[in-house]
């Protein structure tokens, strides 16, 4: 039979369906864009388009149920006990899911079992441990655009961290998206911004982006009359975005959000600006293949707690400019390193677990029994951590951590008394609350588990009380509990005995006491479970009262974990403390690339870097594979490590104020956007030339290589000149255009360096050592030979190279200048030598470029 292709939810015609399907369709109509998991017995079922989509995404069977307008209804399902695995996959694919549970009893329901939506799971609002990556913040982002300005609001519902900011360019917006990497991104249906890259993008109606509504919602959430106390009133676009975000979270959670009790503005000037391209090139969180291995986070993350791991990534992603705060971090690392007690602190921290997310689940009332067990274990560790910090000479950073750790002795004792040692995963089936915690619960449990002993005791009690030796207490399924007396002694039955059944030889009775017991026993299990759930909710109420100090404790532990990890990494990897200066300088002695050094088997060759007010740019030459890119990246990584408060892989390092780090290293076609490799390269270069300042660190590798020799050389020359003379940024400029080394003779702030190599028996040996002055040879053929180019091709190339370097003019041939290897007298280069880059604007540089092209064509 043909499957139905159009869902009746789009037709609003439910009349041809069964009552159960009508119930489903009414619910589905409220959530047209979400997958509805509809509980039916032991399965969650999906219908129509939801079924088709789920079958494809989850690789489950697509079947059919009943008919709709003569067509079979598509259906797919998953077992209820395995639903979390399927939800995890869907969320990671960017899908959102509605969970519709049975809340009625099928045995007593007249018509369809009552059902209601109990959970809405979206990628950015999920809080279940099984659905989350413990190393990554799970952030919901909202962007509100007005003309060329953007308001941004972000919330990590698993921590309560609520942040806003405003941005004035698309480039900065894309940099923030790359930094935050939201799990879910909301934008207005009217948003005109360039296509965004995020895991899950949803468009919201324009009326959700209303400033007045946002103010009202935020004040209600924070229980304030205004937002003045948060210092955000100067950010109207961001406030509007925050209002949309709060509406969405309220819609998905169907519960209060007590752990979201504050909002904070992120100031862009507080942090180093790192654009999306630079973030990828430096491999901060993932490598160039998108994997975490061999990234900076991979190297540094030896944290003991998941929340410490996430905080470390936030530090890496957002280096600070405040040298005072950075010095405090560095001093804390020094203290932990000097005392060599980071191992003991680590051992205690690893017992704490993901306290940050546990506290959030408590606030959302979705905490499971094992969350409370882990919380109890964490609270039990705090006194030891307090003592370990007390034994240290505490600087401001460590003192704040100790103060915020807190001691929760009362909560610890409560959880110790209330929760069994190893509780089940869920409260649903009971067995979570410890014996002895609650007398009514103990009584209900005793009735359920010790009813046989009660009957024995009651029988003995009644025999003694009535003096009737044939008294028996029993039970059957029809009549329930009874007291049995032989017919011969029935006349001696006490007056409070109520006849329940007469048999041939015995009479059976019930007493008020036995009736009460019967009612209790028959309902004791369900009542015990209900009582457990009631007590569990009371525990959550008690914990929610301590929500803010528990959040502060979790934050303090995360900070301690990161600082402790940086101390361990410094010791293990031989990092040293950098020195911060208030004047322009980047001076690194024996610097090393932290990741390359860690993964290579041979000893790493350390190199110096020296940039200051009079030495702004290094033109770096040398062979391919000689280490130019590694050298540039290590300089940037050392700078970045210092600006997160870490020690650095160098013997010594002096660093002045840095506001931005830019890289232009490598490029590939952007086929999706229709951009060639050269266009990508020029776009990245333009972004640097427009945004770099004299406090920026700029890495540029092989600018101009994607076009013809003259175009590329001219562009590289003009860009290097502009960086050195107009922007005066700290720049490492790697090139194979040896003509660029002439800049050092005309511009005082430009110096030449090269990565050394030697040739032996037509083979190249890379020394990877930085030397002053330009390289004298490119070693291109030797590198090609190393790459496996056939020997015959290499020999042919050598012959051609000799011809080009030493041209022989035949008698019948007019002398011709080879286009690829012009002598220095070439008019194009002569014209370049006459230029004064100090007086060039970008427009003038472009005009000169066209003149040079014309000159070349005329020749």
From Swiss-Prot:
Domain of life: Bacteria
Record bears the keyword ATP-binding: yes
BP-aspect Gene Ontology terms: mismatch repair
CDD domains, alphabetized: ABC_MutS1 (cd03284)
Any single Gene Ontology cellular-component annotation: cytosol
A GO molecular function held by the record: mismatched DNA binding
Family annotation (InterPro entries): DNA_mismatch_repair_MutS, DNA_mismatch_repair_MutS-lik_N, DNA_mismatch_repair_MutS/MSH, DNA_mismatch_repair_MutS_C, DNA_mismatch_repair_MutS_clamp, DNA_mismatch_repair_MutS_core, DNA_mismatch_repair_MutS_N, DNA_mismatch_repair_MutS_sf
Annotated keywords: ATP-binding, DNA damage, DNA repair, DNA-binding, Nucleotide-binding
Positions of ATP binding: 622-629
Family statement: Belongs to the DNA mismatch repair MutS family.
Free-text function comment from the UniProt entry: This protein is involved in the repair of mismatches in DNA. It is possible that it carries out the mismatch recognition step. This protein has a weak ATPase activity.
Protein name according to UniProt: DNA mismatch repair protein MutS
Classification lineage: Bacteria, Pseudomonadati, Pseudomonadota, Gammaproteobacteria, Legionellales
């Amino acid at each position: 039979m043909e499957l139905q292709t159009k869902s009746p939810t789009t037709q609003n015609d439910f009349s041809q369906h069964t009552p159960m399907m009508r119930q489903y369709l009414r619910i589905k109509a409220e959530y047209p864009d979400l997958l509805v998991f509809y509980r039916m017995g032991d399965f969650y079922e999906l219908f129509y388009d939801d079924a088709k989509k789920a079958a494809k995404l989850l690789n489950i069977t697509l079947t059919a149920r009943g008919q709709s307008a003569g067509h079979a209804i598509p259906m797919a399902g998953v077992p209820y006990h395995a639903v979390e695995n399927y939800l995890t996959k869907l969320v990671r694919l960017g899908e959102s899911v509605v969970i519709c549970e049975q809340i009625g009893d099928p045995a007593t329901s007249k018509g369809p079992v009552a059902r209601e939506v109990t959970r809405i799971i979206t990628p950015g609002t999920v809080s279940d441990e099984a659905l989350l990556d413990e190393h990554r913040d799970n952030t919901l982002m909202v962007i509100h655009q007005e003309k060329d300005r953007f308001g941004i609001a972000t919330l990590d519902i698993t921590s309560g961290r609520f942040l806003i900011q405003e941005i004035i360019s698309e480039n900065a917006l894309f940099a923030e998206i790359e930094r935050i990497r939201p799990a879910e991104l909301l934008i207005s249906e009217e948003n005109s911004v360039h296509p965004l890259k995020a895991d899950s993008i949803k468009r919201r109606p324009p009326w959700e982006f209303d400033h007045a509504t946002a103010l009202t919602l935020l004040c209600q959430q924070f229980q304030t009359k205004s937002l003045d106390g948060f210092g955000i009133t100067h950010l109207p676009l961001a406030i509007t975005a925050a209002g949309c975000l709060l509406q969405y979270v309220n819609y998905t959670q169907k519960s209060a959000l007590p752990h979201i009790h504050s909002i904070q503005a992120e100031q862009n000037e507080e942090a180093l600006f790192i654009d999306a391209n630079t973030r990828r090139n430096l491999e901060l969180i993932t490598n160039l293949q998108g994997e975490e291995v061999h990234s900076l986070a991979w190297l540094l993350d030896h944290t003991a707690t998941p929340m410490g791991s996430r905080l470390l990534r936030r530090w890496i992603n957002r280096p600070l400019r405040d040298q005072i705060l950075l010095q405090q971090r560095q001093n804390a690392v020094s203290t932990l390193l000097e005392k060599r007690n980071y191992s003991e602190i680590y051992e205690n921290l690893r017992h704490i677990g993901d306290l940050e997310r546990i506290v959030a689940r408590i606030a959302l009332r979705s905490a499971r029994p094992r969350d409370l067990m882990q919380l109890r274990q964490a609270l039990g560790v705090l006194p030891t951590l307090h003592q370990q910090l007390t034994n240290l000479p505490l600087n401001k950073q460590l003192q704040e951590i100790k103060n915020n750790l807190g001691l929760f002795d009362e909560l610890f004792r409560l959880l110790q008394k209330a929760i069994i040692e190893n509780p089940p995963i869920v409260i649903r089936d009971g067995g979570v609350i410890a014996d002895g915690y609650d007398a009514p619960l103990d009584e209900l449990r005793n009735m359920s588990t010790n009813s046989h002993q009660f009957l024995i005791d009651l029988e003995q009690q009644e025999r003694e009380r009535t003096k009737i030796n044939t008294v028996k207490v029993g039970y059957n399924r029809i009549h329930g509990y009874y007291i049995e007396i032989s017919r011969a002694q029935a006349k001696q039955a006490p007056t409070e005995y109520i006849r329940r059944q007469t048999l041939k030889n015995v009479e059976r009775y019930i007493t008020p006491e036995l009736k009460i017991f019967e009612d209790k026993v028959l309902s004791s299990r369900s009542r015990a479970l209900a009582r457990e759930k009631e007590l569990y909710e009371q525990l959550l109420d008690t914990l929610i009262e301590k929500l803010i100090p528990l959040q502060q404790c979790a934050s303090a532990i995360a900070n301690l974990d990161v600082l402790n990890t940086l101390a361990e990494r410094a010791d293990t990897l031989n990092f040293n403390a950098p020195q911060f200066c208030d004047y322009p300088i980047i001076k690194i002695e024996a610097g090393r690339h932290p990741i390359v050094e860690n993964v290579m088997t041979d000893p790493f060759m350390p190199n110096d870097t020296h940039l200051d007010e009079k030495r702004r740019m290094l033109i770096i030459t040398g062979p391919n594979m000689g280490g130019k890119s590694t050298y540039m990246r290590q300089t940037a990584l050392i700078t970045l490590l210092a600006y997160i408060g870490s020690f650095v892989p160098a013997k010594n390092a002096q660093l002045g104020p840095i506001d931005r780090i830019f890289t232009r290293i490598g490029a590939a076609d952007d086929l999706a956007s229709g951009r060639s490799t050269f266009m990508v390269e020029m776009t990245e270069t333009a972004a640097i030339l427009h945004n770099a300042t004299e406090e920026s660190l700029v890495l540029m590798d092989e600018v101009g290589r994607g076009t013809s020799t003259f175009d590329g050389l001219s562009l590289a020359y003009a860009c290097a000149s502009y960086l050195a003379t107009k922007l005066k940024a700290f720049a490492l400029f790697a090139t194979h255009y040896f003509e660029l080394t002439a800049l050092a003779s005309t511009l005082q702030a430009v110096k030449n360096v090269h990565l050394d190599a030697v040739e032996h028996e037509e083979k190249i040996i890379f020394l990877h050592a930085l030397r002053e002055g330009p390289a004298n040879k490119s070693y291109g053929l030797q590198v090609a030979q190393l790459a496996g180019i056939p020997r015959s091709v290499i020999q042919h190339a050598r012959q051609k190279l000799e011809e080009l370097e030493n041209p022989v003019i035949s008698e019948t041939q007019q002398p011709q200048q080879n286009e690829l290897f012009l002598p220095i007298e070439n008019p194009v280069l002569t014209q370049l030598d006459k230029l004064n880059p100090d007086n060039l604007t970008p427009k003038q540089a472009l005009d000169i470029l066209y003149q040079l092209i014309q000159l070349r064509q005329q020749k």
